[in-house]
Design a protein with these regions (language model features):
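Active/binding-pocket-proximal capping segment
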Residues: 60-68, 72, 110-111, 120-138
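Short, glycine-/Ser/Thr-/acidic-enriched flexible segments
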Residues: 11, 50-52, 98, 109-111, ...
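C-terminal beta-strand-rich structural cap/linker in extracellular carbohydrate-active enzymes
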Residues: 152-178
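Glycan-recognition surfaces
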Residues: 1-57, 83, 96
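Solvent-exposed beta-strand/loop surfaces of large extracellular or lumenal domains
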Residues: 132-158
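Conserved, mostly hydrophobic/aromatic
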Residues: 45, 104, 168
Length: 178
């Protein structure tokens, strides 16, 4: 895929899942099999030197998860694929070329899964604030695709971190040095 083949960032996922505006029946052949957390993670997973926000401005307005789209760079110093299996899942981290920030994107297919990652890519002896954008506990592309939880925790390169990905879900993290 080239940098312009796929544009992530859809927040209005549900409107694409129904037969029509008047018929609110979920049509499994007419939807985005994704979640907002996965849409954010795709900004890291898919390399694209030119990024854009693919949804309508009113769907981003006032949404706290839009901050990740504002923060994620397009120029990277380093890229590491931490884990994955073609067609199933992937976790990628990238270091911003203009700062000490790292960005993580982890996505899965229609199967939910848990992946454990070591944070050895972070600088030694430094503490990081991790701003995490994740699907809710019972989320997924069929259930709560537009819900996203945002939390902040402190982590170091000696830590490991467990990522829980519901069906069609994802997780995006920004690591900033304290």
């Amino acid at each position: 895929s080239s940098p312009m083949d796929y544009t992530p960032g859809i927040f209005n996922i549900k409107e694409y899942r129904h037969n029509s505006q008047s018929d609110r029946t979920i049509n499994k052949n007419h939807h985005i099999p994704s979640t907002i957390a996965k849409e954010l993670a795709l900004y890291v997973v898919i390399y694209a030197p030119v990024q854009m926000a693919a949804d309508l401005p009113e769907n981003y307005e006032g949404h706290p998860a839009f901050q990740f789209i504002l923060d994620v760079p397009t120029d990277w110093e380093k890229t590491i694929v931490l884990n994955g299996e073609i067609g199933k899942y992937i976790t990628t981290v990238r270091k911003d070329v203009n700062s000490d920030d790292w960005f993580l994107g982890s996505i899965t297919n229609e199967e939910g899964r848990t992946v454990d990652i070591n944070l050895t890519f972070l600088d030694e002896s430094k503490e990081y604030n991790a701003t995490i954008y994740k699907d809710p506990e019972n989320g997924g592309w069929l259930n709560q695709p537009e819900e996203v939880e945002i939390q902040n925790i402190s982590l170091t390169n000696k830590d490991s971190y467990r990522i829980t990905l519901p069906e069609g879900g994802g997780q995006a993290i920004r690591f900033t040095k304290k």
